Amino acid sequence: MAETLTGKTPVFGGSTGGLLKSAETEEKYAITWTSTKEQVFELPTGGAAVMHEGDNLLYFARKEQALALGTQLRTKFKPKIESYKIYRFFPGADVGYLHPKDGVFPEKVNEGRSFAGKVDRRIGQNPNPATIKFTGKQPYTA
């Protein structure tokens, strides 16, 4: 995937504590988003930064940091910023699109998304674990 990311890095004073130095030999993560106005936000690595109006691009050493910033963008700002995307950069210059994988956030309903672990019954219809204890069946398959 030969995709180039565009956007300006938010303005912040400080450093990443050397985290991105190791990301040059391992992997790093980038988050991109579009803001309708210039506003201050908290960095998951500590400190604060000012996002630009328009496209923004920020690199992190860990996926959790990018996901934390994405959650903050969706919940703390008016209007909510839901147009963010997270990418993974591998050392060999390969780029992989990471989140949201199929274009819809995991907690939203998406037509065609398959169910994971769905059992067609109510909680009251679950079997009593004592009745299946020594049968060799697992409670989640009974």
Swiss-Prot record:
Cross-referenced Pfam families: PsaD
Similarity remark: Belongs to the PsaD family.
Domain of life of the organism encoding this protein: Bacteria
GO BP term, example: photosynthesis
Presence of the UniProt keyword ATP-binding in the record: no
SUPFAM superfamilies: Photosystem I subunit PsaD (SSF64234)
Chain segments carrying region Disordered: 119-142
Gene Ontology cellular-component annotations: photosystem I reaction center
UniProt KW Ribosomal protein keyword: no
Protein name: Photosystem I reaction center subunit II
Role description: PsaD can form complexes with ferredoxin and ferredoxin-oxidoreductase in photosystem I (PS I) reaction center.
Organism of origin: Synechococcus sp. (strain ATCC 27144 / PCC 6301 / SAUG 1402/1) (Anacystis nidulans)
The entry's keywords: Photosynthesis, Photosystem I
